Amino acid sequence: MNAAGVRMVVTRARSRGTGASLRRRGEKAAPLRSGEAAAEERKSYSPVKRRRKAQRLSVAYEASEGEGGEGAEHLQAPSWQPQDWRQQLDNIRTMRSGKDAPVDQLGAEHCFDPSASPKVRRYQVLLSLMLSSQTKDQVTAGAMQRLRARGLTVDSILQTDDSTLGALIYPVGFWRSKVKYIKQTSAILQQRYDGDIPASVAELVALPGVGPKMAHLAMAVAWGTVSGIAVDTHVHRIANRLRWTKKATKSPEETRRALEEWLPRELWSEINGLLVGFGQQTCLPIRPRCQACLNRALCPAARGL
């Protein structure tokens, strides 16, 4: 392009001002033209086409410097949220203010030996979560006490025969299967992680006997990282009763995905313990205590909706 052509493009671009560029912020850059198309454009050059192309390149640069980074989806307002959910959540917080449910005293945060090394504490957290599936907190806590009395480490578990391990964890739910899973997982941790537990959900759920709920809780309790919402049967049941999912869900994992679509991320770490205790004390699986619930006028299930 000669000097006169450059002056013409600059003059017309300035006459448009910066408003068009600001209004177009967030537009995607036009795909690069093929060599044949670019040659054709040079043959039929016009200042208007050149000006539009320059604007698109400018917008693409601005977008690359903007908010499109990792985690940006959590900054956007969700397209759907349940009706009255904030009031319902505040009411549950009020009902749970005493922190006197079984999960508050016997959950995974309370089952490890605080005097053990960080690596051993993380292992004990994972084992308590593996034992907790389909098991009341009181039973899980009792099994953990018996295991800890013998020195609960990866090595000690691998040196314990299956019958002895079964007697120590009985009567947790599916205790025979859990003996097998605990042994297999402990061997993997010894071989691949130097006796520690993985620090990612993907690696945790790859371990025998470890599901998504356990993995997210292990990340929170053992590693102090919020990786997702831990959904068990209590959270699954309450979320559906309150209509906290856009449509009815059939499994805890489906409920987790539905909740994470709209629940603000800063609430993810709180929601499990809050709803589990609420489910243990008030929103029971059978004959829920709706008359004692502050949400009875806001709960679709309580109103028969």
UniProtKB/Swiss-Prot annotation:
Residues 1-83 are annotated as: Disordered. Residues 192-216 form the HhH domain. It is found in: Nucleus; Mitochondrion. Coiled coil: none annotated. One of its GO terms (cellular component) is nucleus. Residues 1-28 form a transit peptide. This is Endonuclease III-like protein 1. Bifunctional DNA N-glycosylase with associated apurinic/apyrimidinic (AP) lyase function that catalyzes the first step in base excision repair (BER), the primary repair pathway for the repair of oxidative DNA damage. The DNA N-glycosylase activity releases the damaged DNA base from DNA by cleaving the N-glycosidic bond, leaving an AP site. The AP lyase activity cleaves the phosphodiester bond 3' to the AP site by a beta-elimination. Primarily recognizes and repairs oxidative base damage of pyrimidines. GO terms for molecular function: 4 iron, 4 sulfur cluster binding; class I DNA-(apurinic or apyrimidinic site) endonuclease activity; DNA binding; DNA-(apurinic or apyrimidinic site) endonuclease activity; metal ion binding; oxidized pyrimidine nucleobase lesion DNA N-glycosylase activity. The record marks 232 as: Important for catalytic activity. It catalyses: 2'-deoxyribonucleotide-(2'-deoxyribose 5'-phosphate)-2'-deoxyribonucleotide-DNA = a 3'-end 2'-deoxyribonucleotide-(2,3-dehydro-2,3-deoxyribose 5'-phosphate)-DNA + a 5'-end 5'-phospho-2'-deoxyribonucleoside-DNA + H(+). The lineage of its organism: Eukaryota, Metazoa, Chordata, Craniata, Vertebrata. GO terms for biological process: base-excision repair, AP site formation; nucleotide-excision repair. The modification Phosphoserine is found at residue 64. Its cofactor is [4Fe-4S] cluster. InterPro entries: DNA_glycosylase, Endonuclease-III-like_CS2, Endonuclease3_FeS-loop_motif, Endouclease-III_FeS-bd_BS, HhH-GPD_domain, HhH_base_excis_C, HhH_motif, NTH1. Binds 1 [4Fe-4S] cluster. The cluster does not appear to play a role in catalysis, but is probably involved in the proper positioning of the enzyme along the DNA strand. The active site is at 213 (nucleophile). It comes from the Eukaryota. Interacts with YBX1. Interacts with ERCC5/XPG; the interaction stimulates NTHL1 activity and NTHL1 binding to its DNA substrate. PROSITE patterns: ENDONUCLEASE_III_1, ENDONUCLEASE_III_2.
